[in-house]
Regions:
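N-terminal export signals
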Residues: 2-8, 15-37
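Metal- or metallocofactor-binding catalytic centers and their adjacent structured scaffolds
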Residues: 47-58, 74, 87, 92-160
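Catalytic alpha/beta core domains of metabolic enzymes, predominantly
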Residues: 268-270, 276, 282, 287-357
Length: 391
């Protein structure tokens, strides 16, 4: 009943009657997509099903990067992904799984997991807790695959409600911090080129460090711009005293925060750095899901929430609130993703301290129109769900 009360409050009467009719018909008839429904072009329907409710379909989609992307542990020119959709009574929710190497997931593992999901047993998409708890129960891992379903379900339900999720959560989009734009480890010439491309477009840059050329990277960028910088070591620093010395040098050169200085397993060393650092230290690889937060408290000043790590928007929103209650700073980030997953993560942006939501800007083959970055500012669309439109 709480959903109907919300709908009464936020919708025009005509829209409420239409949506209420959809929900009632779904509850009584079990959905009209059973039987003769065919998969959208290029998508594979999950044929596993015990009912006639929600319909899940998916297809692989490789993301092509504008530049070779290098961090302290690998380089790549593409990122494997899987596009997901959930169909219900003429409405479609879109989701996405993106699998950079360190997640340990592949197109094959994601598709295998998705093929085991029986959403047809659910005739009411508003049973979000039940649906996502069921999906989560199917394995101990597969977080990116779970995130794809979570994002698609949130998009679908937001569309049924006629509202974007930032509004459903009671957030003010004007409070979203500026997003960083990421510059990967590269030669000085390429770093200069990437930095020039950012001129006038962003107000803060994120720099990948963690190899033996960190100071060269920062100094090269400083030849072009004096914008504030965030740095991400991706667990690349090996000695805690050297890491701390470098952090003091970074502060002197306009860096405002540091992500994951040392290996996530070295909790004591990361805590030692955090205690002495003049800059806020954020956990990235060290934090995956909500249950991880107690284990990192005291070792970092804040956490980086990524939907592909935490299984999606439901848990991401819970992590924001839990971290705040524990006195931690919060950052929302992304992988290399289309505007689908980036726009989903952006729904959280008004509630966090830092944003790194540039994954869609790093690729050449986006599939959607969604959140925008204008003069470095995140602009959240007023469209319902996660605010995206297929291109």
């Amino acid at each position: 009943m709480h959903v109907f009360r919300y709908l009464c409050r936020v919708m025009k009467r005509r829209d409420f009657i239409r949506t209420a009719g959809i929900l009632t018909a779904g509850a009584i008839a079990g959905g009209a997509l059973a039987g003769g429904c065919t998969a959208p072009k290029g998508f594979n329907f999950n044929k596993l099903g015990t009912g006639s409710g929600l319909r899940l379909s998916f297809r692989p989609y490789e993301l092509e990067l504008r530049h070779v992307f290098t961090v302290s542990s690998y380089s790549r020119k593409t990122t494997p992904g899987v596009q997901v959709r959930i169909d219900y009574e003429g409405y479609t929710g879109y989701g996405e799984a993106s699998m950079p190497p360190y997640l340990g997931q592949t197109v094959e593992s994601v598709c295998s997991f998705l093929s085991r999901i029986d959403l047809g047993q659910f005739r009411d998409p508003f049973r979000m807790e039940d649906i996502l708890a069921y999906v989560d129960s199917l394995s101990m891992g597969d977080n990116a695959a779970k995130a794809a379903v979570d994002i698609a379900l949130h998009d679908l339900v937001g569309k049924l409600m006629g509202q974007p999720w930032w509004r459903i959560w009671g957030l003010d989009p004007a409070k979203a911090p500026d997003t960083t734009f990421t510059i990967g480890i590269d030669t000085p010439a390429v770093v200069r080129e990437k930095t020039r491309e950012c001129t006038g477009r962003f107000n803060i840059l994120k720099v990948k460090v963690g190899l033996n050329n960190d100071k060269e990277m920062i100094s090269t960028i400083r030849e072009i711009t004096d914008l504030p910088l965030a740095v991400d070591a991706n667990q690349g620093w090996k000695d805690r005293q050297q890491a701390l010395d470098e952090i003091f040098w970074l502060q002197e050169n306009g860096v405002v925060m540091v992500e994951q200085p040392m290996a996530k397993e070295r909790i004591d060393d990361n805590a030692w750095i955090t205690e002495r650092s003049p800059l806020p230290i954020f956990a990235d690889e060290a934090i995956q899901r909500l249950a991880d937060i107690p284990s990192i408290k005291g070792a970092y000043h804040g956490i980086n929430i990524k939907l592909m790590k935490c299984t999606g928007m439901r848990e991401g929103w819970r992590m924001v609130n839990y971290a705040r209650a524990e006195g931690l700073k919060v950052m929302v980030g992304c992988m290399t993703e289309t505007s689908c997953a980036v726009s989903a993560a952006a729904q959280l942006s008004p509630a966090v301290d830092f944003c790194d939501l540039d994954g869609n800007l790093l690729i050449t083959n986006d599939l959607f129109r969604g959140m925008k970055v204008v003069g470095g500012h995140i602009v959240l669309p007023d469209r319902p769900g996660i605010g995206i439109q297929p291109l």
